[in-house]
Amino acid sequence: AVLPENLDDFDENNQLKLVKLKDGMLKNHGYCATTIDGVECALVTCDEGVFLFTPPESPVEQWEIKQLLDVPASDAVICDFDSDGKLELGIIEKFHGDVLSIYRINDQGKYEKCWEYPEKLEMLHAIWAGTLCGKKRFVVGNRRGNRKTIAVSWEAGEYQTEIIEENTGAANILHFMNKEGKDIIVAANREINEVAMFIFE
């Protein structure tokens, strides 16, 4: 729906008109708002894979919907992790799955897996990607088993990982910069009833 400036006239008897963009997306769990080439768009993940939704320039035009990957995914982020000028996909495979992976674009313009975390991470849930301490990083957390919060980055020609903390079980992760210009990560550690804040120097 196109949101008007004033929503006061809308209620249960007079609702905004919603337009279906796409159906047939089972377990459409993941949503990631992002900007690509200056255009705001969204990644949506489901059993059918990873889709990129790009809004039209005019409300009367159609949205562009592109399937980037046909691998069942719970959540995804898109970021140029290795600084090669192409956007990689960081995904949690399957619904709340245990496989953390990164896909890159091959010479045919298709996404193919280039990295996978070497061990299973039960019930992966928290996910974020962006610039952290001057480098592109992929930060994730899982809610069962070892309950790690992990940062993945491209170092010396390969993906390397760093464990931020263990035995916590992050369900969501938020990143921002404070007034002093320091990177902050806030993790909602659901499994231990804790909200943790990390200040990176």
Locations of the language-model features?
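Beta-propeller-forming repeat regions
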Residues: 1-201
